[in-house]
Amino acid sequence: MTSPQNAIMHSATVPCRVNLIGEWIDFNGGTVLPMALAPSVTVDIQANQTTSDRISSAQFEGAQGVAIDAPATHHWADYVRGALQYARKQAWISTGQDVHVESAIPVGAGLSSSAAIIVATLKAVRPPSASVTDTDLAFAAKDIENTFIGVPCGIMDQMAVALGKPGTALALDTRDCSYELLDMPASWTIVQRALSDGRYRMRRDECLEAARQIGTEFLCDANPDKLGVLDQALASRARHVISEGKRSQEAVVALRAEDRARFGHLMIESHNSLRDDMDVSVPGIDQLVADAVDLGANGARITGAGFGGCIVALVDPAILEEWWRDLKARHSKIERIA
């Protein structure tokens, strides 16, 4: 790509995230606990003085050049283009842009690469003079993903990558988006390994329908005694959301107390609920979680929306390398991401 020689290059880098606990509750009024990871996305942007955006990446297939006001095309570049269209509405930019994306985040691994691309693009084009906070950018990124991309996600991923710093967890109350940044204890090691689709929308719709039938705004607030009015599938989804909301709150307490054993136990309970009630795990992930714990992890669980992808494990640093070697011996195709 070529841009006018006098055009200024703007860049921004944001981390990916792993959700330690609090799955499927960011749109149900629960508290979530994502942690920023070192793998990151960097976006470089330069005005090209045309009416087209030209977007490229070494990690994602196919560069794209498209008119600045074109609709989404179901291409990875839509995440960049949605952010650029938002920026034009805010009068942050006007002409077409040359954009290059460098990503160390594995695609489809449940690490929020889409949210990271949108937030990084917004940060790159945000004028220094704009009174726009990172929280504002997170809300804008969610709106872009909901409306331009068409994914009915919650706010967790955008807040995590906009505000998070590697080595800290974000205790986020999704009712009002109040949050607390918590340092991860030095005696804890979080490891993520990798082994999406319309099923996310289906599970989300089931949660919303369960809340409607029970008569509550937030499913996390539902009384477990009222699950009898739901059919079996909706009752299972509600049971997970209610119990996961309580686990997340307990996990924040355990993190503050540096109680690794309790935190790990909550992770295991979370995975079991995601497997049995939310029905978003798969046999290969279940075995990986079981082996991770069998070999000495305090806890492990599937992370992200589910249906494969990644697990996250809590491991004593003193046994980390031996534990990883033994787990790799049982599952040769896994990759250690962080």
Where do the language-model regions lie?
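DPxDG-like acidic metal-binding loop motif
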Residues: 36-39, 111-131, 312-315
